[in-house]
Curated annotation (Swiss-Prot):
Coiled-coil spans in chain: 124-259, 312-329
Phenotypic consequence of gene deletion: Pale green and unable to grow photoautotrophically on soil. Decreased thylakoid content.
Designated gene of the protein: VIPP1
Signal peptide: none
Organelle targeting sequence: 1-64
Location of the region described as Disordered in the Swiss-Prot/TrEMBL record: 287-312
A biological process from GO: vesicle organization
Quaternary structure, from the entry: Homomultimer. Complex formation involves interaction via the central alpha-helical domain (71-286).
Protein name: Membrane-associated protein VIPP1, chloroplastic
Species of provenance: Arabidopsis thaliana (Mouse-ear cress)
Membrane topology: Peripheral membrane protein
Record-stated family: Belongs to the PspA/Vipp/IM30 family.
Subcellular location: Plastid, Chloroplast inner membrane; Plastid, Chloroplast thylakoid membrane
UniProt keyword list: Chloroplast, Coiled coil, Membrane, Plastid, Plastid inner membrane, Thylakoid, Transit peptide
InterPro entries: PspA_VIPP1
Amino acid sequence: MALKASPVTGLFPPLRPTASSSPSTSSNRPCSLRILPLRTSFFGNSSGALRVNVLRLACDNRLRCNGHGATMNLFERFSRVVKSYANALISSFEDPEKILEQTVIEMNSDLTKMRQATAQVLASQKQLQNKYKAAQQSSDDWYKRAQLALAKGDEDLAREALKRRKSFADNATALKTQLDQQKGVVDNLVSNTRLLESKIQEAKAKKDTLLARARTAKTATKVQEMIGTVNTSGALSAFEKMEEKVMAMESEADALTQIGTDELEGKFQMLETSSVDDDLADLKKELSGSSKKGELPPGRSTVAASTRYPFKDSEIENELNELRRKANDF
């Protein structure tokens, strides 16, 4: 902000700034306070009045420019953010297959328009060419008429014929210029049409490739999404639980088999024990029923025994003697 001085007297309100005082001059002018004597009849010749420069505030143009620039910068940033979000939203809705189809359709539409424009230009060129030929023919005809009139001695008629001939010749020259320009336009249109046709063919071939790639990418994405939704850890934990359960069932079956085998072996051991006890009881009876200790029961003789078992086993004999000793103790 700049301070602007405006001189006033003590009797009148402050004066407004004039058109001659520019803002740049007032902004660079320092603030000042001037005291000048004023001689009036109201105060008397000896009295002095003070004329004070009233201070006014003026807006600095530089601050205005800075504020305007900051506002524009903020607006541009906001506009950029909005455009970025809009582009992201539009990109999310874009389907490559539909976009490619629409692009090919638009290119075919442009090709149709270009062909129509080429046809119109060719028709216009044909008209110009016909007009040029007609003007050239008229120019030649009037030249022949001028020759004929001059041969007949009518110079005035020959002069008029030459004027007509010049008019048609000028028209033919102008038509020739337009025709040359038209040929350049036609050549350019034909070249661009052929180029667009080749581009469309290339775009169609590329469209098929891109569509195949897009479909493959979509399929791969769906497969990955399906794989991502599968809880692999849960499936593995379920397999581990089932494995533990199967192992527990196998252990239980082995235990039951072992228990059944132990019971069977126990039964056979009991049978063997009972047979041994029976043999021991029979042996006791035989020993207790004999008349003399150490005498064999009736029907048994040493000869028969020796005859039956010709070879004696020392271990068996020792066991037998031990049994005899125990029987005598009883």
